[in-house]
């Protein structure tokens, strides 16, 4: 069996756990984790990661030489040794719980011990511009499919199938929703406020995108216009194409926002246009760091306007690095297991 690399785990997480988009001016804290069984190769691997907005700040990997919760942002490094000891202790407890849960779920689904399986988890809270809780959420996924989710009222659960109904009944018997609600309405909000204050220079900044439009001939009769937005933060951005002032939806390709590896993000939107009609098309960019929305056209020149290979290669590689994997047990101790 091939052992999964962290990048693969991130892709699994992004595919199964749906992230709620934060509103403009809002902030979020999210923890993700993934436990992957590997029969014949020891205990399941457990990876965990925490994010404030679009910035990773903690990381844990059970396969490291000395597994500990580690800082990934300068503003969290100032926390004392007691903080990191508790983070590590709680994360290891969460990892052990998920290893047991993997065995339990394999039994629920009557699956072979020889096959590998994945349990994913996400919890988080969003704050509005007034600093109050907008929403809280917790989700579980098994083998890349929805399993169990805390409802928006933070008082009840939604089970995806018959097996998940068993876990739902266990959560209800243990008053798990009440525990989660206390964390999401209290501890999560308090720590998010603390992190936003300690890391305000990084977390509350708004870096505007660097934008340009490139031209790529496809056939003699049509071409692709690609609108680029590079180096922006936070990640939320809107790119649209218009033809003669009307929004275009057909023949438009829009990629997901991707991390650039330096704390900023990248995105592009492309549209296929008839050759000779390029100037009828405009790209419109909206981002928090811009004083007003931008409107761009392709500027024809004697040189080809293809993006440099470094940018293209970087985007391809970075497409696999998505917000993914960490642990809410960092801030609350998981008291029930499937």
Swiss-Prot record:
UniProt-annotated glycosylation sites, renumbered to this chain: 110
Q: What GO terms are given for molecular function? A: peptide antigen binding; signaling receptor binding
Signal peptide location? 1-24
According to the UniProt record, where is the region Alpha-2?
115-206
State where it is primarily located.
Answer: membrane
Q: Where in the cell is it found?
A: Cell membrane
InterPro entries, per database record = Ig-like_dom, Ig-like_dom_sf, Ig-like_fold, Ig/MHC_CS, Ig_C1-set, MHC_class-I_related, MHC_I-like_Ag-recog, MHC_I-like_Ag-recog_sf
- Gene3D superfamilies per UniProt: Immunoglobulins, MHC class I-like antigen recognition-like
Q: Keywords of this protein's UniProt record, alphabetized?
A: Cell membrane, Disulfide bond, Glycoprotein, Immunity, Membrane, MHC I, Signal, Transmembrane, Transmembrane helix
Q: Which PROSITE patterns match?
A: IG_LIKE (PS50835), IG_MHC (PS00290)
Its domain of life reads Eukaryota
Q: Does the keyword Nucleus apply?
A: no
Q: Which Pfam families does the protein's record reference?
A: C1-set, MHC_I
Disulfide bond positions: 125-188, 227-283
Q: Using the record's annotation, list all stretches that form the Ig-like C1-type domain.
A: 209-299
Query: What is stated as this protein's family in its record?
Result: Belongs to the MHC class I family.
Q: Which PANTHER family match?
A: HLA CLASS I HISTOCOMPATIBILITY ANTIGEN, ALPHA CHAIN G, MHC CLASS I-RELATED
Its function, per the record, reads:
Involved in the presentation of foreign antigens to the immune system.
Q: What is this protein called?
A: Patr class I histocompatibility antigen, alpha chain G
Identify the coding gene.
Answer: Patr-G
């Amino acid at each position: 069996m091939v052992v999964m690399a962290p990048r693969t785990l991130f892709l699994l997480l992004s595919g199964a756990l749906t992230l709620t988009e934060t509103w403009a001016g809002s902030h979020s804290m999210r923890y993700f984790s993934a436990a992957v069984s590997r029969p014949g190769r020891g205990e399941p691997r457990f990876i965990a990661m925490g994010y404030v907005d679009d910035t990773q700040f903690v990381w844990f990997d059970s396969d490291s030489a000395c597994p500990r919760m580690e800082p990934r942002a300068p503003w969290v490094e100032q926390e004392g040794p007691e903080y990191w000891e508790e983070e590590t202790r709680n994360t290891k407890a969460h990892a052990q719980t998920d290893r047991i849960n993997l065995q339990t779920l394999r039994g629920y689904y009557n699956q072979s011990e020889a096959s590998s399986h994945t349990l994913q988890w996400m919890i988080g809270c969003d704050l509005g511009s007034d600093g109050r809780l907008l929403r809280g959420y917790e989700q579980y996924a098994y083998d890349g499919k929805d399993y169990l989710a805390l409802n928006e009222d933070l008082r009840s659960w939604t089970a995806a199938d018959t097996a998940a109904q068993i876990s739902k009944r266990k959560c209800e018997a243990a008053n798990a929703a009440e525990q989660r609600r206390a964390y999401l309405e209290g501890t999560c909000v308090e720590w998010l406020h603390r992190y936003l204050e300690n890391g305000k220079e990084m977390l509350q900044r708004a870096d505007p995108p660097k934008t340009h439009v490139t031209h790529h001939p496809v056939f003699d009769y049509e071409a692709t216009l690609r609108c680029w937005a590079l180096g922006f933060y936070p990640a939320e951005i809107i790119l649209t194409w218009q033809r003669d002032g009307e929004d275009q939806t057909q023949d438009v390709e829009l990629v997901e926002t991707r991390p650039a590896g330096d704390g900023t993000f990248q995105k592009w939107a492309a549209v296929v246009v008839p050759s000779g009609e390029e100037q009828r098309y405009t790209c419109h960019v909206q981002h928090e760091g811009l004083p007003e929305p931008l409107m761009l056209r392709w500027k024809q020149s004697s040189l080809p306007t293809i993006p440099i290979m470094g940018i293209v290669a970087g985007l391809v590689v970075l497409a696999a690095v998505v917000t993914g994997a960490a642990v809410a047990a960092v801030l609350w101790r998981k008291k029930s297991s499937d």
